[in-house]
UniProtKB/Swiss-Prot annotation:
Residues 15-33 have a biased composition (Basic residues). Keywords: Cell membrane, Developmental protein, Differentiation, Gastrulation, Membrane, Neurogenesis, Transmembrane, Transmembrane helix, Wnt signaling pathway. InterPro entries: VANGL (IPR009539). One of its GO terms (biological process) is otolith development. A motif (PDZ-binding) lies at residues 523-526. This is Vang-like protein 2. Residues 1-95 are annotated as: Disordered. Its main location: membrane. The chain crosses the membrane at residues 110-130, 149-169, 179-199, 216-236. One of its GO terms (cellular component) is membrane. Ubiquitously expressed at the 4-cell stage. In early somitogenesis, becomes more abundant in anterior neural tissue where expression is seen in the neural tube but not in the notochord. Plays a role in non-canonical Wnt/planar cell polarity (PCP) signaling to regulate convergent extension cell movements during gastrulation. Acts together with scrib and prickle1 and localizes prickle1 and dvl2/dsh to the plasma membrane. Has an overlapping role with kny during both convergent extension and eye development. In the eye, involved in establishing proper alignment of the anterior neural plate and midline cells expressing shha and shhb/twhh.
Length: 526
């Protein structure tokens, strides 16, 4: 009987549609079947999970179905429990990107540079040790001049070691699609220098067993000098050349139109892309796809409220065609008020956000008044009135309950709930309590949208980006160049514009020419 009463209520709801006569006939047929076959006819109406209400929030409203309700109605079947949405696929692909092993590519370049640099640093020492180990007895004595060269060689090697560590052995923060041309050029130059010195050393020193040890020491010092000059060249090409601004980059996010302008120097396309991404995570607001959708009332608005069907014979088609054309013309002249609906939807959203914000601020202010930092002298002065002493974590959990509902409603209204979990809010609250921050400092993260870096996971790896360019990525920036950095859900389009040439003139003004005369009027008071 319960199922029958539920079914009757559902049928009563459906009877308010425009096609009520058809639904009433179907209801009578189903009702007769339900009396005959007892429970089997009842189960064919709807299936609810245990503990769930029969009618949801949408079904409790008035039935506003149109003539096309049979075509536009979505039926939830049992297979929907195992279906996967596009958002789930995007989230799964992001997790796969984050878990992909990029450590080998990340450290391959520094490892190769370190091995080559270590080989170059050990080469001068090998030049000095090999004669001492192989033909020490036949070497000519070298006194004070060699000792001075030893000191010079030691300090030069120390400077070369420290500068090489600071310049080349830094861990890379990105993996480039192509080799860095200048870095590869410098590595090839170092290898050629060292190989040439070893070849000359083998032909002129090792093979004839050179006895002039002072000349061998000078030869090693000359190699260190050459390595120092190569390092100066590397400093200019890798660190100094791009410091002078030469181009202006306009970066636009394709989804919401957020844009920024940056001035850069002479860079290749791939290095400019890395430079843009470094600033993107700190300058651009976080990408929130939930803010891009128009209100549902606008998206579901019908452009026309009728349909014209030609069901008559050939002799009656002329009148119906004329009437249909007149109705279509009237509908075309009807003014579309979607912009008005959008305006009022935006105004209503702003009002709701301000309302939720006010409630959240008041709730947080009241919650912060429930705790107080306990000083050591206060605890010792009032032993007769013991109070519960909590650590920052317990205090954060205690005061989070009064503000939880207001926080949840505010985040849901502003569509920020995917970026703030309950655990992250409690951790941030614990951080603010530990450092004696005010409620305004606690709310700053939620009231003001932060940059993209603020919402990155602490242990997450870098995101996978795809550089799309019509030019080779190793080419230099030039006027009118356009390239994009793509991800699964959006892209960054970068337009390159050279900075203008400034022609600055000069005009001299004599300081004695600054003279003034007071213009007196009848109303002037002096």
């Amino acid at each position: 009987m319960d199922n029958e009463s539920q079914y009757s209520g559902y049928s009563y709801k459906s009877s308010h549609s425009r096609s009520s006569r058809k639904h009433r006939d179907r209801r009578d047929r189903h009702r007769s079947k339900s009396r005959d076959s007892s429970s089997r006819g009842d189960k064919s109406v709807t299936i609810q999970a245990p503990g769930e209400p029969l009618l949801d929030a949408e079904s409790t409203r008035g039935d506003d179905r149109d003539d096309n309700w049979g075509e536009t109605t979505t039926v939830v079947t049992g297979t929907s429990e195992h279906s996967v949405s596009n958002e789930d696929l995007t989230r799964a692909s992001k997790e796969l990107e984050d878990s992909s092993p990029l450590e080998c590519r990340r450290f391959a370049g520094p490892i190769v540079s370190g091995v080559l640099g270590l080989f170059a640093l050990l080469t001068p020492l090998a030049f000095l040790l090999l004669p001492q180990l192989l033909w020490r007895d036949s070497l000519e004595p070298c006194g004070t001049p060699c000792e001075g060269l030893y000191v010079s060689l030691a300090f030069k090697l120390l400077v070369l070691l420290i500068s090489s560590w600071a310049l080349f052995l830094r861990p890379s923060r990105s993996t480039l699609p192509r080799f860095f041309v200048f870095r590869c050029l410098l590595m090839a130059l170092v290898f050629l220098f060292v190989a040439s010195y070893w070849l000359f050393y083998g032909v002129r020193v090792l093979e004839p067993r050179e006895r002039d040890y002072r000349g061998i020491v000078g030869y090693a010092v000359s190699l260190v000098d050459a390595l120092l000059f190569i390092q100066y060249l590397a400093l200019v090409l890798l660190e100094v050349r791009h410091l002078r601004p030469a181009f202006c980059l306009k970066v636009v996010r394709t989804t919401d139109g957020a844009s920024r302008f940056y001035n850069v120097g002479h860079l290749s396309i791939q290095r400019a892309a890395v430079w843009v991404l470094d600033h993107y995570y700190t300058d651009f607001p976080v990408y929130n796809p939930a803010l891009l959708n128009l209100p549902k009332s606008i998206l579901s608005k019908k452009m026309s409220g009728f349909k014209v069907y030609s069901l008559g014979e050939e002799n009656s088609t002329n009148n119906s065609t004329g009437q249909s054309r007149a109705m279509i013309a009237a509908a075309a002249r009807r003014r579309d008020n979607s912009h008005n609906e959008y305006y009022y939807e935006e105004a209503e959203m702003d009002r709701r956000v301000r309302k939720r914000k006010a409630r959240l601020v008041v709730a947080v202010e009241e919650a912060f008044t429930h705790i107080k930092r306990l000083q050591d002298d206060e605890a010792a002065a009032s032993p007769k009135h013991p109070r519960e002493v909590m650590d920052p974590r317990e205090a954060a959990q205690a005061i989070f309950a009064p503000m939880a509902r207001a926080m949840q409603k505010y985040l849901r209204t502003t569509r920020q709930q995917p970026y703030h979990s309950m655990e992250s809010i409690i951790s941030h609250l614990q951080f603010c309590i530990t450092h004696n921050m005010t409620p305004k400092a606690f709310l700053e993260r939620y009231l003001t949208p932060g940059p993209t870096m603020q919402y990155q996971r602490e242990n997450g790896r870098g995101r996978q980006w795809t550089l799309v360019s019509e030019e080779p990525v190793t080419a230099a920036l030039r006027q009118g160049l356009v390239f994009s950095l793509r991800r699964l859900d959006f892209a960054l389009v970068v337009t390159v514009t050279p900075l203008p040439f400034l022609n600055l003139g000069e005009e001299f003004i004599d300081p004695k020419s600054h003279k003034f005369v007071m213009r007196l009027q009848s109303e002037t008071s002096v």
